[in-house]
A protein has these predicted regions:
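Surface-exposed binding/hinge segments that line
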Residues: 81, 117, 130-181, 207
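Alpha-to-beta junction loops
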Residues: 118, 154-156, 247, 252-261
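Aromatic-rich, solvent-exposed beta-strand/loop patch
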Residues: 100, 159-177, 192-246, 267-278
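Aromatic- and charge-enriched surface segment that lines or borders ligand/interaction sites
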Residues: 78-130, 247-250
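Short, well-ordered beta-strand elements
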Residues: 29-40, 78, 88-92, 118-121, ...
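N-terminal lobe/hinge region of extracytoplasmic solute-binding protein
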Residues: 34-84, 123, 130, 196
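Bacterial signal peptide processing site
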Residues: 21-23
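C-terminal motif of bacterial Sec signal peptides marking the signal peptidase cleavage site
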Residues: 16-19
Length: 278
């Protein structure tokens, strides 16, 4: 139930982030949110903190994702097939997904995501040297690194040791985001604060316990139902005020665009008797 509630919140937050439009005067559109706890890491392999999951979800993508009804939908994988015996899952990847620009890539331009990237990313979750908190995703389900196979650049396969009907749903977890091997290996443990993914926003700045800034990924691959490029926002700015009253005052002053976990005692400060925002 806790996971379902978290997924629902993430979907609501994503909807808000993607649906905000630019002002008529073409000002930069920044989404301001407060997180009541600091992040533990921006590395998907350690996405165990609720707030980290929300922010990592802006920077990274996986094979699949959930829609507003919590149905598993395509993301970087455009289609997939499950073997009749339930022991292998084969994913066909999009060919228009690129990692965000980084100096470690040729000419500083993000390269195309391949099946090899997923094989590397998923093995990280079970690699004892990494000690990922997401190892449970594949625990007792895969054998070792040989379970993650890049059949070619655009076809990725996972081999299970036994059938697990809900397996595809597990892959929507933020732990299962794709990361670039060369960047992770270059930064090592510092990848936690130098993340490079494929998501709608790219990392800009993080001062722990104070502020996190993400900028629009101009090369993001997803579009809305009308074919318009997402995201519509130019940036996301997260502050880390752990005192709820102080954070709520910032919301009332319109310094924040989104506020969650509203205490019932604040209801009259933000809602009229008819239920409208004051």
């Amino acid at each position: 139930m806790r996971t379902i509630k978290l997924n629902i919140f993430c979907i609501c937050l994503l909807t808000t982030l993607f649906s905000c439009k630019r002002n008529n005067n073409d000002e930069k559109k920044v989404f301001n949110i407060n997180l009541d706890q600091n992040l533990t890491s921006l590395d998907p392999a350690f996405a165990r903190n609720q707030n980290a999951i929300w922010m990592i979800n802006q920077i990274f993508n996986g094979l699949v994702q959930v829609d507003k009804n919590l149905n598993t939908m395509p993301c970087i994988a455009k289609t997939w097939q499950v073997a009749e015996d339930g022991l292998s899952y084969t994913f066909n990847l999009r060919n228009d997904v690129f990692f965000q620009d980084d100096a470690l890539f040729k000419n500083g331009k993000g390269r195309k995501v391949t099946a090899q990237d997923f094989a590397y990313s998923f093995y990280r979750l079970i690699d004892p040297k990494v000690a990922s908190s997401g190892g449970w995703i594949f625990s007792d389900k895969v054998k070792d690194a040989s379970s993650f196979v890049a059949l070619n650049d655009s076809t990725f396969q996972i081999k299970l040791v036994k059938p697990f009907p809900a397996f595809i749903n597990l892959l929507t977890a933020q732990y299962c985001s794709v990361v670039p091997k060369e960047v992770v290996e270059h930064y090592g443990k510092d990848f936690r604060n130098h993340p490079v993914g494929t998501g709608p926003f790219k990392f800009k700045y993080w001062k722990e316990d104070e502020v996190l800034v993400l900028l629009k990924n101009e090369n993001y691959f997803e579009k809305d139902s009308a074919g318009k490029q997402m995201p519509f926002l130019d940036a996301v700015k997260a502050t880390f005020i752990n005192d709820k009253q102080s954070a709520f005052m910032n919301f009332l002053k319109k310094d924040l665009d989104f506020f969650y976990s509203v205490d019932g005692s604040y209801r009259d400060d933000i809602l009229t008797k008819s239920g409208q925002m004051t």
